[in-house]
């Protein structure tokens, strides 16, 4: 079996441009377990990059400064300089006034999930009857949520590195965290205790709702861009869509043959990508529950029985680029792949040993990927100028579900294009 179909020559696939890597400091104890980078994240405004570098530690790095350091290291490679290795101390010396600071945060337990949240003051708390709150989040507030091995969630102030809240209700590992993108500071946590919990940080972190329905571990969750729908995925081939206004299950998506471990919506909310241990990434229409595209990582495509068991092509993570046209995936075959939604073969590939997670930068220009040794690797995302047709499609689909597209008085071919049926 191979990583690419017979019609594709691996040597002809583009090579992703490697930018740099971050290496954690050497731990004071020799333990291989607990040093994994299970998650990486970029702040919504692009100001910070965060990753769990293992052994309870989360590192917050100013992204522009980090990116600039990669350029410097590239120039120094001729002199034999290695990758950037971070010290255990915060590099706060020689900072200009107002310049973002690096922070090293000891979370007290192994970190599995990370998420940035930013506040919009005019977005009211869902608990409208409560007039007094301990925390008054301003317009420039930026928070970091960390999900821990002991089931706790800790909320940190990104600018100061100080602990603000400690959320306790899960009874097992908090595997993933996601903030609503509307600035409401509504946080959803996915746990191995088979539940999703909804927290309102503007109401001092009170829990709003428990979403039940998964019969096994919940691996990941993701909000739609308008915050109205939540996708959650987990063990047992589960892909659930939830109405976040009523906190009810909308539908289940069926098509995977193994555990589903990652999910993400496209920027216009018209597409949903899910990654599974069955060697595939499936791109869905979340409005109609139909499969639009399958991105295979093992060829010939395995049978459902083989895909449902142990194989060496487990897809660990998937991420949508902010241009709405590119997807990245991390797999156990030691490759990171960059896909275009217009093609069924990778546009570019890069080497990555023991990759676990990936995320695009806010502007979509860089992909970061974490690995089992606590390091993070960065590649330049393959970019091209989007057609005006695609930009118009994204603009329209941000406000129009698939069902409404097919009521428009336009040719059927244009309806199919707007509905992404031409993928």
From Swiss-Prot:
SMART domains: SOCS, SOCS_box, WD40. Disulfide bonds: none annotated. This is WD repeat and SOCS box-containing protein 1. Component of a probable ECS E3 ubiquitin-protein ligase complex that contains the Elongin BC complex. InterPro entries: G-protein_beta_WD-40_rep, N2O_reductase_N, SOCS_box, SOCS_box-like_dom_sf, WD40/YVTN_repeat-like_dom_sf, WD40_repeat_CS, WD40_repeat_dom_sf, WD40_rpt. Probable substrate-recognition component of a SCF-like ECS (Elongin-Cullin-SOCS-box protein) E3 ubiquitin-protein ligase complex which mediates the ubiquitination and subsequent proteasomal degradation of target proteins. Keywords: Repeat, Ubl conjugation pathway, WD repeat. It comes from the Eukaryota. One of its GO terms (biological process) is intracellular signal transduction. The gene is wsb1. WD repeats lie at residues 125-166, 169-209, 213-252, 255-294, 310-347. Residues 76-100 are annotated as: Disordered. Residues 373-423 form the SOCS box domain. The SOCS box domain mediates the interaction with the Elongin BC complex, an adapter module in different E3 ubiquitin ligase complexes. Pathway: Protein modification; protein ubiquitination.
